[in-house]
Amino acid sequence: MQGETQQIQDALRDVIDFEIGLDVVSLGLIRDIETDDSNVKITMILTSPMCPMASFMMNQVHERASESTEKSVEVVMGKEMWHPDMMEAEARETLGI
């Protein structure tokens, strides 16, 4: 299932946080992708708890993940707070962090 998880993660790179201009994977917003025989559960967080684009971004994550797998997809909001240290190194470099 590792290949499937990677495939879903790669698809989620198309989902952009428009306030920052980078994808949700590079920003570290996708915290977990769990798969079993018929389901995918994606746990994500936002850069800000008051993000006005929260529902839009969750819908985008759901759509892209659903396009990359035949399984039922659920997207849930994680409880942890986002921190720039969660970003991939290249994303931090792009933003000068």
What kind of feature is each model-predicted range?
Residues 1-97:
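Domain-level signature for proteins that mediate thiol-based redox and metal-cofactor handling
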